[in-house]
Amino acid sequence: MTSKISCFDRAVFRRALKKTAPVWILYTLYELLLPLRLFSFCRGVSSCTDDFLVQIEKTILGYARINASLLPFLLGGLLAWVLFFWLFRAGTAYFYAALPVRRETLFLTNYLTGLLLCAAPALLSSLLLWAVGAGFGAAVFVPAMQVFTATMLGFLLFFSFAVLVCCVVGQMAAMPIVYVILNFTFFVLETIVRHLLFTFVYGMPYSQSSTMQSFALHATPVLGLLQGGFRVQTDWLERDGMYYMEYAPRLEGWSYLGMLA
């Protein structure tokens, strides 16, 4: 039998959908909860406030922070673990190798399936966020698409890394452990070294900020994105000389997120 030249196989795709059904169903439910949360927020905030529309936009952008860090860290690792389980058992690997499907096709089909399972619910959620915001008079198409973009960049980072770990480790129980360890290696090592210096070097403050500490934080994507690397920033406007009002909310840290992805 001749091998297929295509980079995508429908039979492998359907099998991957069935294997990962619990994962992408839970993920889809989470994404659908975001528009409901926004709707609840909009109903709870008075539309008479001066910054009502700004608060809607800021709330939508706030979803991008988790969607670009903690969510893809968990989802990417879990999807890679399920999609590439055939690498973990010799019998399963031999079975797939005997199929009339090129190895490139097998790998790319599973990889593209993972990207699709993240992109489809994320895009649906972003469109619903746009619809909810528009229902309350806010033009939030751009912020909603920014949430989608941030989600995909974060997922591309963690899913690709998890796939690499699967290919290198090739052991079912060890893969999640190695995945977590490698994601937090720099931060843990820097913390240990700082603690040792604090213990044995006289006058060394434990909380001293250093270049190495900042590097370790940015080299740990989950923590780096959560702790200021990717954040919502707003400007403040003076009104009537008495108080300040937020305006022009935006996401900062796109270069850091793009560099990681």
Enumerate the predicted regions with their spans:
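Long, hydrophobic alpha-helical segments
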Residues: 63-92, 103, 111, 118
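Aromatic- and glycine-rich beta-strand/loop motifs that create alpha-glucan
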Residues: 1-28
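Hydrophobic cores of alpha-helical transmembrane segments in multi-pass inner/ER membrane proteins
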Residues: 75-78, 154-160, 257-260
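Start (N-cap) of specific transmembrane helices in multi-pass transporter permeases
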Residues: 15, 19, 105, 109-118, ...
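Terminal transmembrane helical anchor/hairpin motif
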Residues: 41-62, 185-261
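Secretory targeting signals
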Residues: 57-68, 113-179, 184-203
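Hydrophobic alpha-helical transmembrane segments of multi-pass membrane transport/permease proteins
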Residues: 18-46, 67-78, 181-189
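Short helix-to-coil transition segments within interhelical loops
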Residues: 97-104
